[in-house]
């Protein structure tokens, strides 16, 4: 018996559906009831997909090798029917990211003539989101769904050809993955919205060159696209989706949805090793920027970065910025001889450690440390640069890193000089920062001074350095996630001539604020809240920002209250932001 198909007849002005098929050499037909039409259409489409698979089956080394469709039909890799089931099955047990709801609403919502752009840096869960959505589809929807995989060998004309074929066959839901690999995507992206979305297709575009999507929105898509970001991964998602609990684990590995958590599998995290972090910076960030600039305006928009790109020094500049991301993004960061800001801070803190003061780091050969860091991070110092790094380079690199959602500025307000504009640049991927810190520790361990002191003292010094780094990073994480979760508030650090409030949450409309100290400690001690209880600081703050509604210490211990100070557990605080 043949698969058959649906035809329609008009009788007395009314349209009726009929199922026609061939059986024993004879054509047969029957009327299809309205309530069974959708299910029957799905069964027919599924049977057709299976038939195509059988026709395209080849034998190689005794094993069956399947292609999604005959090579003569599609020019890209198109998956439909049974292949979609195989494609989505491996992620059925995975927990979903919060942005899954927006993807679901677009696919199943009313047609609005727009495409959805799912973009973000590598390993932030874009393809997994698509596979999860396809995996939850019923048979009727899946029969009208196709997943299109493209690469650098394909062109926009190839994708256009395949989308027309899919449209003619009744496919409605099309996911195009790695679409930014198309060299002509940025200049021709309007094809997806102006031709296919307006025709009733739901088009989801995804890719790792997120900068390319930003360019295409400006050049081609305008208001005909919905942008769905995946790069920013807050702690609450890291814990819930990956099943990895604890702020220190987030500091070490946060920033990607690499399948390293208990809810995924036991593969290594992206930032578990220095090499992994370096590879990520090179492929997900530097090459992202390079590829997008190469394709944007036919390579005519490199601006001041042209020389850096041509001489292979863009990765060098980005690495330098990431290493010193906690400090002002100034020309000095890019042009000075490489030196570790983390080491300078740790030297000072170790000298004034109340329990175990030591000047061991004063004896460390700082040049040797810098050289080891240079070797590990593969960063050329200024003398090795074949092109001068100027202020224009700094500005443009910072712009692109912000477009990639990789960095975010947090205001730093000086109470003594309110007109002074300052900010701290926070990295959205803490694991990348921590990987560089571990490289610093390796450099210290190789210094001769450390070989001359006891292993107990040596380990204590190293532990203190890493604790200082984690403390600074925890502060940044709290600031960033609070800013992202509370866009109706102003989030900033407030500095005084002596001391500071680590975070102020200012409600300008209601003339009130909250003040915070952020400590990496797991113990509540009086010294943590001395600034919060400073009457002069609080009076100046209330004069400028209104009534103080709450005083808080965010730390790693249990939530509790001591007098007028609320102690908040950091993991609980970050999860409550959702």
Model-derived regions, located:
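Conserved lysine of the Walker
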Residues: 126
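Conserved catalytic cores of phosphodiester-cleaving nucleases, focusing on short active-site segments
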Residues: 482, 501-526
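Interdomain motor-coupling "hinge/lid" segment immediately C-terminal to the ATP-binding subdomain
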Residues: 215-360
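Sensor-1/coupling segment of RecA-like P-loop NTPase cores
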Residues: 195-217
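Hydrophobic positions on the alpha1 helix immediately C-terminal to the Walker A/P-loop
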Residues: 129, 133
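Accessory nucleic acid-recognition modules appended to NTPase machines
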Residues: 293-501
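Domain-level recognition of nuclease-like catalytic cores that cleave nucleotide substrates
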Residues: 549-578
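A short, basic N-terminal segment
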Residues: 33, 46-111
């Amino acid at each position: 018996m043949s698969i058959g198909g649906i035809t329609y007849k008009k009788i007395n002005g009314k349209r009726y559906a009929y199922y026609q098929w061939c059986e024993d050499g004879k054509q047969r037909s029957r009327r299809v009831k309205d309530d069974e039409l959708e299910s029957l259409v799905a069964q027919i489409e599924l049977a057709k997909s299976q038939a195509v698979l059988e026709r395209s089956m080849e034998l190689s080394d005794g094993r069956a090798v399947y292609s999604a469709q005959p090579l003569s039909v599609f020019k890209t890799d198109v998956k439909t029917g049974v292949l979609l089931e195989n494609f989505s099955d491996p992620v059925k047990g995975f927990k979903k990211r919060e942005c899954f709801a927006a993807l679901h609403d677009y696919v199943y919502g009313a047609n609005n003539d727009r495409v959805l752009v799912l973009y973000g840096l590598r390993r932030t869960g874009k393809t997994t989101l698509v596979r999860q959505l396809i995996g939850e589809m019923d048979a009727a929807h899946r029969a009208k769904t196709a997943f299109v995989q493209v690469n650098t060998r394909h062109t926009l004309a190839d994708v256009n050809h395949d989308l027309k074929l899919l449209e003619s066959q009744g496919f409605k839901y099309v996911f195009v993955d790695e679409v930014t690999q198309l060299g002509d995507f940025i200049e021709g992206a309007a094809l997806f919205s102006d031709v296919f979305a307006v025709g009733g297709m739901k088009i989801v575009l995804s890719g790792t060159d997120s900068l390319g999507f930003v360019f295409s929105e400006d050049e081609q898509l305008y208001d005909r696209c919905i942008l769905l970001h995946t790069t920013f991964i807050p702690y609450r998602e890291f814990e819930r989706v990956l099943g990895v609990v604890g702020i220190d684990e987030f500091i070490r590995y946060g920033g990607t949805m690499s399948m390293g958590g208990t809810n995924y599998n036991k593969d290594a995290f992206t930032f578990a090793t220095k090499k992994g972090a370096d590879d990520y910076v090179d492929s997900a960030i530097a090459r992202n920027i390079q590829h997008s600039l190469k394709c944007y305006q036919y390579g005519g928009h490199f601006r001041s970065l042209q020389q850096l790109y041509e001489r292979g020094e863009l990765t060098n500049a980005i690495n330098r910025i990431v290493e010193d991301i906690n400090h002002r993004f100034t020309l000095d960061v890019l042009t000075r001889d490489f030196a570790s800001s983390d080491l300078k801070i740790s030297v000072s803190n170790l000298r004034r450690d109340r329990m175990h003061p030591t000047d061991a780091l004063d004896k460390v050969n700082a040049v040797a440390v810098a050289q080891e860091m240079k070797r590990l991070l593969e960063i050329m110092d200024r003398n090795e640069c074949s092109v001068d790094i100027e202020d224009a380079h700094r500005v443009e690199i910072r712009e692109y890193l912000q477009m990639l959602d990789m960095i975010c500025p947090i205001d730093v307000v000086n109470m003594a000089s309110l007109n002074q504009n300052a900010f701290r640049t926070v990295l959205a991927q803490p694991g990348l920062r921590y990987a560089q810190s571990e490289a610093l520790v390796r450099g210290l361990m190789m210094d001769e001074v450390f070989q001359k002191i006891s292993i107990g003292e040596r380990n204590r010094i190293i532990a203190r350095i890493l604790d200082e780094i984690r403390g600074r990073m925890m502060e940044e994480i709290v600031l960033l996630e609070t800013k992202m979760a509370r866009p109706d508030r102003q989030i900033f650090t407030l500095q005084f001539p002596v001391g500071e409030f680590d975070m102020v949450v200012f409600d300008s409309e209601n003339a009130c604020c909250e003040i915070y100290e952020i400590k990496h400690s797991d113990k509540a001690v009086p010294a943590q809240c001395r600034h919060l209880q400073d009457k002069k600081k609080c009076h100046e703050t209330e004069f400028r920002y209104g009534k103080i509604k709450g005083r808080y210490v965010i730390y790693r211990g249990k939530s509790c209250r001591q007098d007028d100070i609320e102690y908040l557990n950091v993991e609980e605080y970050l999860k409550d932001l959702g």
